[in-house]
């Protein structure tokens, strides 16, 4: 694809995406479903942006956009508020996440008539298990509910994003697309390394930023560090020693620690970074969802719509609720609170970026996938069902769960009356 064509497509996505996002704001609905539909219209329906060109652009826009969103989301999360809900968040991001992944994978294999142990289903489960801060944060800024409930779901979504990426990488090892000698060791090095390196860079940045007033230069400094984390963890280290760390998880950890440190120090540079991240996150959302819609070919929709719809419904109404109820057994939460958590897990940016990235990888490296997998399903069908299944999961979960968030909060949790002026969680 020519450079000027790519610039034209990006410009078109931004102009139309901004108009659509403004309409969504006026209608008081999340912009994600409208951006996805816009992508479908200018992609497969009107053929303005060819599917292959959309995929090419996504290879760059997806990973860079994820950095913006994870950094911005973690940067505004307060550790003091996180401490209040940490037990629930840890359960949701471990037990609930894993159960949701496994049940979604099981349903996927059942719908597509694959062996129950086939890694194809569990790859879909890993891609779609992460919930979405880009949907939840705007929803809870409008819905009056107990701040602890809102913070729990927002924190869960910020930290399960990198977990979704890590678990997808580990399962890709079974496809021969991610060098993996031992999935368990990979998981430990990817997550553990990310925490150590993310904290280390955050500490270095904290010292530099507090002692030198960077002002408008602070945002590129922090963003550049986040991009280098991704490069070092996901590319440089694995090529040198065979083991890396999850760059995305390191970005989230760095954002959380640095944002909190600068906020508590009342450092002027904090505001520069927040407004910069907000602007970039908006750009990333427009690119990721418009190009996800545009990536889809009409033939894909025709072939995979029914299985895609079934696995999406299974993921939203079976996998997530079972994951929440099993994950929170014996916790302090009432049945109604658990039900609210179960029905508020919209999927968004990370599943969108992962589905297309994984789809591209599978199609590019079809010859590397083991025969034990391809004798039941072709690489083209793997990529198609995962992309359409994820698309349907995002579309349905965001439309339904953002629409009923306020009504369910009122029905299940009752009207929230603050006892005193709550400290903002943003």
UniProtKB/Swiss-Prot annotation:
Gene3D superfamilies: 1.20.1530.20. One of its GO terms (cellular component) is plasma membrane. Keywords: Antiport, Cell membrane, Ion transport, Membrane, Sodium, Sodium transport, Transmembrane, Transmembrane helix, Transport. It is found in: Cell membrane. It is a multi-pass membrane protein. Its main location: membrane. It holds the Pfam family Na_H_Exchanger. Changing residue 156 to A: Almost no change in activity. One of its GO terms (molecular function) is identical protein binding. GO terms for biological process: intracellular potassium ion homeostasis; sodium ion transport. Active at pH 7.0 and below. The chain crosses the membrane at residues 1-21, 29-49, 57-77, 95-115, 120-140, 158-178, 184-204, 208-228, 236-256, 286-306, 309-329, 382-402. Changing residue 320 to A/D: Loss of activity. This is a Na(+)/H(+) antiporter. Can also transport lithium. Belongs to the monovalent cation:proton antiporter 1 (CPA1) transporter (TC 2.A.36) family. This is Na(+)/H(+) antiporter 1. It comes from Methanocaldococcus jannaschii (strain ATCC 43067 / DSM 2661 / JAL-1 / JCM 10045 / NBRC 100440).
């Amino acid at each position: 694809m020519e450079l000027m064509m790519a610039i034209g497509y990006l410009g078109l996505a931004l102009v139309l995406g901004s108009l659509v996002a403004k309409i969504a704001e006026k209608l008081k609905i999340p912009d994600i479903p409208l951006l996805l539909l816009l992508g479908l219209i200018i992609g497969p329906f009107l053929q303005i942006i060819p599917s292959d060109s959309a995929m090419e652009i996504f290879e760059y826009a997806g990973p860079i956009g994820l950095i913006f969103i994870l950094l911005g989301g973690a940067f505004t999360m307060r550790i003091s508020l996180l401490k209040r809900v940490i037990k629930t968040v840890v359960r949701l991001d471990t037990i609930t996440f894993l159960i949701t992944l496994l049940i979604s994978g099981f349903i996927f294999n059942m719908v597509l008539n694959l062996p129950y142990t086939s890694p194809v289903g569990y790859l879909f489960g890993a891609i779609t298990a992460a919930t979405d801060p880009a949907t939840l944060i705007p929803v809870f800024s409008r819905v009056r509910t107990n701040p602890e409930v809102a913070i729990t779901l927002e924190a869960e979504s910020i930290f399960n994003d990198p977990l979704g990426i890590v678990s997808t990488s580990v399962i890709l090892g079974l496809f021969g697309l991610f060098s993996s000698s031992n999935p368990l060791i990979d998981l430990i090095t990817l997550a553990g390394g990310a925490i150590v390196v993310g904290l280390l860079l955050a500490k270095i940045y904290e010292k530099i930023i507090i002692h030198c007033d960077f002002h408008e230069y602070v945002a590129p400094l922090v963003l550049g560090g986040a991009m280098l984390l991704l490069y070092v963890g996901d590319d440089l280290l694995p090529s040198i020693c065979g083991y890396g760390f999850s760059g995305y998880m390191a970005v989230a950890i760095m954002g959380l620690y640095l944002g909190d440190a600068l906020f508590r120090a009342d450092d002027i540079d904090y505001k520069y970074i927040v407004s910069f991240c907000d602007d970039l996150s908006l750009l990333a959302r427009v690119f990721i969802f418009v190009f996800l819609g545009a990536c889809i070919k009409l033939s894909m929709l025709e072939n995979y719509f029914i299985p895609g719809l079934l696995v999406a419904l299974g993921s939203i109404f079976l996998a997530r609720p079972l994951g929440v109820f099993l994950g929170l057994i014996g916790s302090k939460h009432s049945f109604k609170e658990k039900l609210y958590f179960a029905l508020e897990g919209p999927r968004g940016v990370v599943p969108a970026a992962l589905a297309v990235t994984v789809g591209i990888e599978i199609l590019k490296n079809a010859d590397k996938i083991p025969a034990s997998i391809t004798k039941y399903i072709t690489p083209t069908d793997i990529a198609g069902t995962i992309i359409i299944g994820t698309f349907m999961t995002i579309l349905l979960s965001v439309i339904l769960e953002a629409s009923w968030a306020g009504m369910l909060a009122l029905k299940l949790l009752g009207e929230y009356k603050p006892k005193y002026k709550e400290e903002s969680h943003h």
